[in-house]
């Protein structure tokens, strides 16, 4: 493999890692929001 190809792969992997991290953070926030809504609904109907 050429050095340039290795660098391109490193950049691609770095971007993928960041995108995965951002996606995980977003999913955690969504999950937290759903949990809060569920608690509110439970309290409201109880």
Swiss-Prot record:
Protein function: Stimulates the phosphotransfer from phospho-DegS to DegU. Affects protease and levansucrose production.
InterPro entries, per the entry: DegQ
Q: Which gene encodes it?
A: degQ
Extract one GO BP annotation from the record: positive regulation of single-species biofilm formation
Q: Which species does this protein come from?
A: Bacillus licheniformis (strain ATCC 14580 / DSM 13 / JCM 2505 / CCUG 7422 / NBRC 12200 / NCIMB 9375 / NCTC 10341 / NRRL NRS-1264 / Gibson 46)
Taking the record's annotation, the residue ranges forming a coiled coil are: none
Q: What Pfam family is a match, any one?
A: DegQ
Question: Which family is it part of?
Answer: Belongs to the DegQ family.
Output this protein's name.
Answer: Degradation enzyme regulation protein DegQ
């Amino acid at each position: 493999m050429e050095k340039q190809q290795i660098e391109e792969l490193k950049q691609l992997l770095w971007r993928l890692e960041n995108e995965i991290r951002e996606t995980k953070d977003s999913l955690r926030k969504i999950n937290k929001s759903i949990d809060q809504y569920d608690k509110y609904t439970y309290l409201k109907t109880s």
